[in-house]
Amino acid sequence: VPDPDFTEAVLAVVERIPAGRVMTYGDVGIAIGSEAPRAVGRVMALYGHAVPWWRVVPASGLPPQGHERDALPRYREESTPLRRVESPEEYRIALSAARLPYTHEIYADVML
């Protein structure tokens, strides 16, 4: 079970990711002062249902594993830049356009 302070910080960052933008698991970790993308992924797997989980993606730009079909309509609704949409299971987020920098000012007060 992830540390409660770490969990709270991860969820606070994810709640602040604007519609149409994404952060990678690593970016979320760096934003809170940690370099633990796997730990961020664990928090999202356990507690991410309460926040916009589709806005946190692997560095590959793929949607969250196992949630590709559920995430696609959310990306389309939010106008998240996508690339290579071949099917509801096969697409990527265009990170060059959609990625929110982990240095963004909206995260300045969320640190471990």
Task: Provide a role label for each language-model segment.
Residues 1-112:
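Nucleic acid-binding interface residues in structured DNA/RNA-binding domains
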